[in-house]
Amino acid sequence: MKILFAFLATLFLASPAWAVDVMMGANGNLVFEPAEVTIAAGESVHFVNNMLPPHNVVVEDHPEISHEGLAMMPGEEFDVTFAEAGDYTYWCGPHKGAGMIGTVHVE
């Protein structure tokens, strides 16, 4: 029983702190994948640069949670935490005109 508890505790502690992964530049395209996600209030979205840079995340009307610094290297990653319920539109600053836009629904 102690071994099972230790194993389960290790799995729980090793779990990521975010709710969902979003790839920036998925499959070589200027998109967020998935472009629309739903999370609970207080959870984070984990953004991963999946192609050549630069990419960032600008959250409309919420500069306090935006990650405007550019992710310059493939594999670079960061989290954005959404504390309050609502719908949040975000985009990549350099590629918004190309349609690199997404939405986070926070329940």
Name each region found by the language model:
Residues A17-E107:
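Extracytoplasmic copper-binding redox domains, predominantly the cupredoxin/blue-copper superfamily
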Residues M1-F5:
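Positively charged n-region of N-terminal signal peptides that target proteins for export
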Residues A6-F7, A17:
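Cleavable N-terminal signal peptides
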